[in-house]
Swiss-Prot record:
Renumbered residue ranges of the record's region Disordered: 923-960, 1057-1097, 1115-1158
Record flagged with keyword ATP-binding: no
Protein name in the entry: Histone-lysine N-methyltransferase ATXR7
Positions bound to S-adenosyl-L-methionine: Y1382
SUPFAM superfamilies referenced in this protein's UniProt entry, alphabetically: GYF domain, SET domain
One cellular component (GO) term of this entry: nucleus
Start-end of Polar residues biased regions: 1057-1071
Biased amino acid composition, Basic and acidic residues: 950-959, 1115-1124, 1140-1157
EC number: 2.1.1.354, 2.1.1.357
Length: 1423
């Protein structure tokens, strides 16, 4: 603990100033108190008065307050420890060794004279007395083991040192610390002046100390001689010379005491007769117990009814009256309060002192830096010396500066006993170098001045503030073993005065020395007075030898520099980076300029090696370091003068570089020969090499001191941080790239797969058509060989077939897609018939396309010729007769075919019906082939004219061969596009032997095209079971069952008659029924025919049945193929047929009335609409479309209501009950089930019809409300989340609030906006009323806005009151947030959108041009 450079009076005054309390006493007597010595402004009379009552300098009545002041607690001592006794033989021995006299006349038996210790001192290793210290400082040193327990301390009582006691008594007898342990000694307390505490060292005291001690002696003598001794008391506490109290006074005294222990009615009377108070009896008793007031003190009552009595008498009467038990209990409470208050004050004082020290240190450092900057400015105008001379002069100055600084510090910190001459020379030398700060000549001298100034100020006050925090964990054991229990053994190395040219002679600039740590001047003492005297003699011998004294001071200074570095290293870490940077720059510049002297490094290395061998340490001399530092600084200063770029930061770094680099000097700690088991403090181990900071940076905290778990935790945190950074960068870098590649590859694969599929289908179709063409050619060749004699008409047909087979268009016409059919498995007869059916179908479609090209009558005739030609090629000779008859029938109907519209409809219906018999027909390619070759169409039309004549001839021949079997053939009206347009009649007398099975199939095909399989199976049923089994194997066998063939003929005749009967109707009625008949023929199939329908036909029938009839009029011939190619698209757009939908046969009754068959009763099926109906939208109304706020200007609503129609007004006022914008939901397009809302509506209607009551009540609405939860929203702030699944169109919650008028809503809106609430909870019902849910509303007001909401609002009138209900717009899953659309036209620019949905309605108020662009884009998409 470093001593503070102050005398007794100043120290006591500063300490008493913080303990002073407010009192009613006059300031001239008690205004300035101290611990041990009175101030000069206090008179002798006042001191005598104070001694009468407190008997010491601190017993002033001014220090007494209403809260009892325990002096033991003031010093921070533990009063709970037990007291003990010890002999004071050591104290007597110390008293004899000190040689101080014993003053008489101060007997302990005198009760009025109480002794108090105002300060404490102890002797150091050099025999010097250090102090005075307060009791708290000694107690802190003892508790932290900084001071040993056996250290002898001397109390200062009334300005004089008393007998010494061990420091451990502070813990053993805490109650006697305030009295200086005077009452523990049986002898007389010796109060002697401390003029010379130790005779050997008295000659070295300063003149100032002699004057102070002389003054103290005079004051003590005056106090002893003029002391007024109070009257003595006996052992029972009664006053000897005091009169006994009479009965009246006793009663009056008892009455005063009966007022209470806390009643303040007693005054203390001083020597001059003045009263001080009032005080309570408890306060007086407490002061008496702690010795603050003597028993002989006079006490006077407040009313002055009693004469003054002594305190002992008053306490005795009080004890008798209230009893010991009752008195001790309140005293304990008061004592506890006083202890707590004093403890708090002590802690507060220590905190204030620490802050004051730090503030003082900051002020010192700032003043030093400012002085240095001023010196630097003045130094810039001076011319620097050469580096060689500067090194020599500065090296010598540094040594002298170190000596002067250390000596000056020792003289200021302690009461040094050296002679006056040595002190004055050191002071003169110190003042000489202090002047150099004001008149600095170069940069190096300023550095030495700064270091000296730092030493001078920091050595006094920085130990507790800096060093103690750094070495507190290891200082206890180390100082106990190395400082307090060993003798000083200062080993020094004399400076060599040899030549400076030889480094082997150890010149002064390279001298190194070692020192012992126990040479510190501020922390040494001995266990007894004999050691102190011996050390005093040793120090006196060292002071006689000047050279030895200088070496001791130099060693101490060097050690202090090392400790200063250890403390600065922890507090000046900010400058380490600057130093490292400067060192690196210096080394780099030196290497670049070639100024590194190789010999100097070699010599330095040799020197370090030799010193290491001697001391076992890597020691670098301090003077050498100073020289190098100053030379580098000189070089930097010269560069700075030329460039003028030296900043204050670089200067400060260079200032501390010298102090920091002195840490390279290690401390050679030689431990005791005794067995010491305590570990040495860090940095003081033996044989440790300390590298220079110039080449290597030393961290403040070593790596070994870091716990292993902290290292693992740090590594884990670093890895986690690195992982997060890498993952974030990876996602942003690769995710987008991979997504683009995936989309590009997906798109490309779709395109490639589509192209490959189309190419594969086209390739298969071409191959199949080639095979069909080849087979047809072979069949035609065989027919020619079998029928050499053919009529003219047959020759024309053969020529036509050749042209069709040779032309390229035949390949396109015959492109047929037949999936799931293997042609190789069929028999030749089956294959031939299949090909014939396909060609027939393609020819009919060809006729339809030609009619679209306005070929007209010729084109249709051509189609008939082509069909007849193909039939004649493939059938046998007897089939030609049937074909001729068919041509004759078509010839009779050429007049009706001239009507283009009817013919077009006929062809379209033929094509639609023919598609059902085929698996897949590629009409698109056929259409392209026809459009690419118009010349072929013209040729075909020309050929059809030539064939028409032949048809007439063939008709005459066919009529004759029929033998008049059919007298009146029914005519086929041109309105039908089915097989009726190619109407035929078969004679009942046609021999069934001449009809082959193939011909029967042909007849069925012409009668019911599209039902090829059905007709074939129907005829198969008419045959015998054996023939039915052979139907798929041998179709050329003419045998059959005659009865069943007859039945088949009758069925064909009846069908033909019924069809011809319809032809007799007018063309007008046929046109009206055309649409219904088309749908009926596709969908309504007789039961016997529906059994034979294939899966493909059924699918096509369903598609065509659901197709819109209105589009059927404009449907081209190739549209059915498109529908057949993409059935999935149509199925997705249309609802499937209901399960309960039934099909009815179109033929109700075939009976004949009046010789004429009745028309077929047709009943169309009820079909679902293929397209959803479009609802009417009202967009011109300035309403809040579900928005939870109102318009700023209500006149918009008023202006609109004046112009609006009655219908719109009624709708807004709630007559329509709902907002039209939210009618329906998307789920209605994909679901065919009744929603829960519909079921409830039906139930309400039933109940209302049954009971006649209004069932729509609020209780039902509350029961229907869904379970929602109020929680944090992902959209904005707070929101509502569904806790259960909610179906579409279900009621969710009601928007509840306060119903106000529009004018009031505008006022509230402005108020809400000023308050920061906003107007998002105002919901407009109509142009007159607004629903305000800001302060009085339900949780529905927290539903957030979304541009893609899942709910919508409805305004419904319930019992004449409009209410706002929120319904689900779509299916809402559990956990999904409820939202609806706030937006409406008037306030798009006022409400910001936070939903973040990728919707064009999500406008942004900060960027208006983006909103316009989005709106324009959206409207363009709609158009």
């Amino acid at each position: 603990m470093v001593a503070v450079d102050s005398t007794f009076p100043s120290h006591g005054s500063s300490y008493s100033s913080r303990r002073k309390k407010v009192s009613a006493l006059e300031p001239n007597y008690f205004g300035s108190m101290c611990m041990g010595v009175y101030s000069d402004d206090v008179s002798i009379s006042a001191r005598e008065v104070a001694q009468d009552y407190s008997c010491d300098s601190c017993g002033d009545l001014a220090t007494v307050s209403s809260a009892c002041c325990n002096f033991d607690e003031l010093c921070g001592l533990d009063s709970a420890l037990e007291m003990g006794c010890r002999s004071n033989e050591d104290c007597r021995a110390g008293q004899e060794a000190s040689g101080s006299g014993i003053a008489s006349g101060l007997d302990k038996s005198v009760p009025g004279y109480t002794m108090y210790a105002s300060g404490w001192m102890y002797g150091n290793q050099q025999g010097q007395m250090c102090g005075p210290y307060t009791q708290q400082q000694l107690y802190d040193g003892l508790s932290t083991n900084f001071l040993p327990e056996d250290l002898l301390v001397y109390p200062i009582i009334n300005g004089y040192t008393a007998n010494s006691v061990p420091l451990k008594y502070f813990k053993q007898f805490p109650d006697h610390v305030a009295t200086g342990f005077a009452y523990l000694q049986n002898g007389i307390i010796s109060v002697a002046p401390s003029v010379t505490s130790f005779p050997p060292s008295s000659s070295n005291a300063t003149v100032h100390q002699d004057e102070i001690q002389t003054e103290h002696a005079t004051s003590a003598t005056h106090l002893i001689s003029h002391q007024t001794m109070p009257p003595q008391t006996s052992s029972n506490g009664s006053v000897l010379d005091q009169l006994t109290l009479n009965h009246e006074e006793s009663n009056m005294l008892a009455s005063f005491l009966s007022l209470g222990n806390e009643h303040a009615c007693w005054f203390l009377v001083d020597g001059e007769g003045r009263n001080h108070g009032p005080h309570s009896i408890l306060e007086l008793f407490s002061w008496q117990q702690h010795g603050y007031v003597s028993d002989a003190a006079l006490i006077r009552d407040g009313e002055n009814k009693l004469r003054p009595i002594t305190l002992a008498s008053l306490i005795g009467v009080w004890r008798v009256k209230c009893g010991d038990a009752n008195c001790d209990e309140p005293v304990t409470g008061v004592n506890f309060i006083s202890e707590v208050s004093e403890e708090l004050s002590v802690h507060l004082q220590s905190g204030i002192m620490k802050i004051a020290r730090r503030a003082l240190l900051d002020e010192i450092i700032s003043s030093v830096i400012s002085d240095f900057l001023k010196a630097k400015k003045s130094d810039e105008h001076l011319k620097s010396y050469p580096p060689t001379s500067a090194v020599e002069s500065i090296s010598s100055r540094v040594i002298n500066a170190e000596k002067s600084v250390v000596s000056n510090t020792e003289s200021a910190g302690c009461k040094n006993t050296m002679n006056e001459g040595g002190h004055s020379s050191i002071a003169a030398e110190s003042s000489k170098y202090t002047k150099s700060v004001g008149s600095i000549e170069n940069f190096q001298t300023s550095c030495s001045a700064v270091c000296r100034t730092l030493h001078h100020h920091c050595m006094q006050i920085m130990w507790n503030a800096v060093f103690y925090d750094t070495v507190a964990t290891h200082s206890s054991c180390w100082r106990k073993n190395k400082i307090w229990f060993r003798s000083s053994d200062i080993s020094t190395v004399n400076y060599c005065k040899g030549s400076h040219t030889k480094y082997s002679d150890k010149p002064e600039s390279f001298e190194s020395f070692t020192c012992r740590v126990d040479s510190s001047s501020s922390k040494t003492a001995y266990s007894d007075e004999f050691d102190l005297a011996t050390n005093g003699a040793r120090v006196r011998g060292l002071s006689s030898d000047t050279y030895g004294t200088e070496s001791v001071i130099a060693s101490i200074s060097e050690h202090v520099e090392n400790e200063l570095f250890l403390s600065l290293k922890t507090h000046l870490t900010d400058y380490t980076s600057i130093l490292i940077k400067d060192g690196a720059n210096n080394t780099t510049s030196s290497a670049r300029d070639g100024k590194m002297h190789e010999g100097s490094f070699r010599e330095q290395y040799n020197l370090e090696g030799s010193s290491k061998k001697k001391n076992g340490l890597n020691v670098v001399p301090a003077k050498l370091r100073f020289s190098n530092d100053f030379s580098d600084s000189q070089r930097l200063l010269q560069e700075g003068e030329s460039s003028e770029q030296i900043t204050s930061e670089d200067i400060i770094a260079n200032i501390f570089s010298t102090a920091l680099e002195t840490s390279d000097i290690p401390v050679n700690d030689e431990l005791d020969a005794l067995a010491i088991h305590e570990p040495p403090p860090p940095g003081c181990e033996s044989n440790i090499n300390m590298p220079c900071l110039r080449y290597k940076y030393q961290p403040v905290r070593s790596k070994e001191s870091i716990p292993e778990i902290k290292a693992y935790v740090s590594m884990a945190l670093c890895r986690q941080k690195l992982h997060n950074d890498v993952m974030r960068d990876w996602k942003s870098l690769f995710l987008k790239c991979y997504l683009n590649e995936f989309l590009a590859s997906l798109k490309g694969s779709h395109q490639v797969s589509r192209k490959e599929t189309l190419a594969l289908k086209k390739r298969k179709t071409v191959t199949r058509n080639k095979k069909l063409v080849q087979s047809n050619i072979s069949n035609q060749t065989a027919e020619k060989l079998r029928k050499p004699c053919v009529g003219a008409s047959e020759k024309v047909l053969v020529k036509r077939s050749k042209k069709l087979s040779d032309s390229h268009s035949m390949k396109e016409v015959l492109k047929v897609d037949t999936p799931s059919i293997d042609l190789s498995v069929r028999k030749p007869s089956q294959q031939k018939m299949r090909n014939t059916d396909r060609r027939d179908h393609c020819i009919i479609k060809d006729a339809t396309k030609l009619h679209k090209e306005k070929v007209g009558k010729d084109a249709f005739s051509k189609v008939i010729c082509d069909k007849s030609q193909d039939l004649e090629m493939e059938d046998e000779f007897d089939d030609a007769l049937l074909i001729t008859r068919l041509r004759r029938i078509s010839r009779n109907k050429t007049k009706e075919l001239r009507e283009c519209r009817n013919a077009a409809k006929s062809c379209e219906e033929i094509s639609v019906t023919a598609e059902e018999s085929e698996e897949t027909v590629d009409c698109k390619d056929h259409e392209e082939s026809l459009s690419n070759k118009p010349s072929q169409k013209v040729k075909k039309a020309h050929t059809s004219k030539l064939k028409r004549k032949n048809l007439s001839d063939a008709r005459d021949e066919g009529t004759k061969s029929c033998n008049g079997a059919v007298k009146s053939f029914t005519e086929i009206s041109g309105k039908e596009g089915d097989t009726e347009s190619l109407g035929l009649a078969i004679s009942d007398k046609v021999s069934h032997q001449n009809l082959s099975k193939r011909r029967k199939s042909k007849i069925a095909l012409f009668l019911f095209p599209g039902f090829e399989n059905t007709s074939r199976k129907c005829f198969t049923k008419l045959l015998s079971p054996e023939d039915a089994a052979k139907n798929g194997q041998d179709m050329s066998n003419p045998t059959g069952n005659p009865p069943r063939l007859a039945e088949g003929k009758k069925f064909v005749e009846k069908s033909a008659c019924s069809i011809s009967q319809k032809g007799r109707k007018s063309s007008q009625s046929s046109i009206l029924k055309r649409k219904h008949q088309l749908d009926e023929k596709i969908s309504n199939v007789p039961s016997r025919r529906r059994l034979s329908l294939s899966s493909t036909d059924s699918e096509d029938a369903v598609i065509k049945e659901d197709y819109d009839v209105r589009n059927e009029e404009k449907l081209p011939c190739h549209t059915s193929d498109k529908l057949q190619k993409g059935p999935n698209k149509l199925i997705r757009r249309r609802k499937p047929l209901a399960k309960h939908t039934t099909e009815r046969s179109p033929i109700k009754d075939l009976s004949v009335d009046d010789g004429r068959p009745k028309p077929i009763a047709l009943k169309p099926l009820e079909k679902l609409s293929s397209k959803p109906s479009k609802k009417k939208l009202f967009l011109s109304i300035p309403k809040s479309d579900g928005c939870a706020r109102t318009s700023i200007n209500g006149w918009h609503w008023h202006a609109w209501s004046l112009k609006a129609s009655a219908e719109e007004r009624a709708r807004v006022r709630g007559s329509s009950c709902v907002h039209m914008q939210h009618f329906g939901s998307k789920s209605s397009l994909t679901q065919n089930v009744l929603s829960a809302r519909t079921n409830r509506a039906k139930l309400r209607n039933l109940l209302a019809a049954a009971d006649g009551a209004d069932v729509l009540k609020m209780s039902q609405l509350k029961a229907r409300k869904k379970h929602l939860r109020f929680q944090q929203s992902k959209i904005h702030d707070w929101g509502l989340v569904a806790l259960e699944p909610i179906e579409a169109e279900d009621f969710v919650i009601e928007y509840v609030g306060e119903l106000i008028r529009s004018s009031i809503s505008e006022i509230r809106e402005r108020q809400y906006e000023k308050m920061g609430i906003g107007s998002s909870y105002l919901f407009r019902l109509d142009d007159g009323y607004v629903l305000d849910a800001t302060k009085r509303g339900g949780i529905a007001r927290f539903i957030n806005h979304s541009c893609e909401p899942n709910c919508y609002t409805k305004i419904i009138s319930v019992e004449g009151k409009k209410k706002i209900f929120i319904y689900a717009k779509r299916h809402i899953d559990a956990g999904e947030e409820i939202s609806y659309n706030y937006k409406f036209p008037l306030e798009d620019d006022k409400i910001p959108c936070n939903c973040g949905a990728p919707n064009v309605y999500c406008f942004c108020e900060q960027v208006p041009w983006i909103a316009k662009l989005k709106r324009r884009t959206w409207f363009s998409r709609r158009n």
